[in-house]
């Protein structure tokens, strides 16, 4: 669900390796329709929404999600994504999503404490995303002072999820392949990566060309 990573181009590559892609919440139904017509496998993607609907009944992210799921009911997964899920309305929002979509897999987050993991699973989430601040472009810890070291959060939250028949997804902090192995060893049932895939041509980001001159170059010496 990260800009430059949660794209259809990335999804088409990852689906060849049995990997899921969470498509960004700003993607329109028309863009979904075009991607499906060009070979996107619905079983390999998740639709995504934020929580703007709590305050705005006509929130675009949620209405887009509804339209996409109506067009493509074979999509199995819904991801409800916010940087910090510690606000009083989040659990109630997950309840509402579960009531509206009883047969979908709901991924909710992000949190870092076992108590919140249990609360979300009990109230409708199948998978809880774990991680506040470890992502390569995340500033939540520095801006708000909220966060837990990622491996510690995974270990504690995995134990809580297992106790209520749920799952966790480690989200953030993976810089090297070994970090994925550590997350799985810590108890994560799945791992979300973003920064490791950022910058590839499939991400659709803006291409910037830079000319670098080394110190021995005549231009640099002039």
Question: Where are these predicted regions, by residue range?
Answer:
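Gly/Pro- and small hydrophobic-enriched strand-loop and loop-to-helix capping segments
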Residues: 190-199, 221
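Anion-binding and metal-coordination hotspots
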Residues: 207, 212
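Single conserved hydrophobic/aromatic residue that forms the stacking wall/gate
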Residues: 213-222
């Amino acid at each position: 669900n990260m800009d430059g990573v949660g794209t259809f181009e990335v999804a088409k590559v990852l689906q060849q390796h049995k990997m899921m892609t969470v498509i960004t919440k700003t993607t329109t139904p028309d863009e979904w329709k075009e991607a499906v017509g060009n070979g996107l496998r619905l079983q390999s993607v998740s639709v995504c929404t934020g929580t703007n609907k709590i305050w705005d009944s006509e929130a675009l992210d949620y209405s887009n999600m509804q339209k996409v799921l109506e067009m493509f009911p074979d999509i199995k997964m819904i991801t409800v994504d916010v940087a910090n899920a510690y606000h009083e309305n989040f659990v109630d929002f997950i309840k509402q999503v579960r009531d509206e979509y009883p047969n979908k897999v709901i991924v909710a987050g992000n949190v870092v404490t076992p108590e919140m993991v249990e609360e979300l699973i009990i109230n409708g989430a199948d998978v809880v995303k774990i991680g506040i601040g470890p992502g390569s472009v995340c500033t939540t810890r520095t801006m708000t002072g909220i966060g837990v070291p990622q491996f510690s959060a995974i270990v504690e939250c995995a134990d809580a999820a297992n106790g209520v028949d749920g799952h966790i997804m480690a989200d953030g902090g993976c810089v090297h392949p070994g970090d994925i192995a550590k997350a799985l060893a810590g108890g994560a049932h799945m791992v979300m990566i973003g920064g490791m895939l950022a910058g590839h041509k499939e991400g659709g980001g803006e291409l910037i060309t830079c000319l670098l001159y080394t110190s021995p170059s005549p231009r640099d010496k002039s």
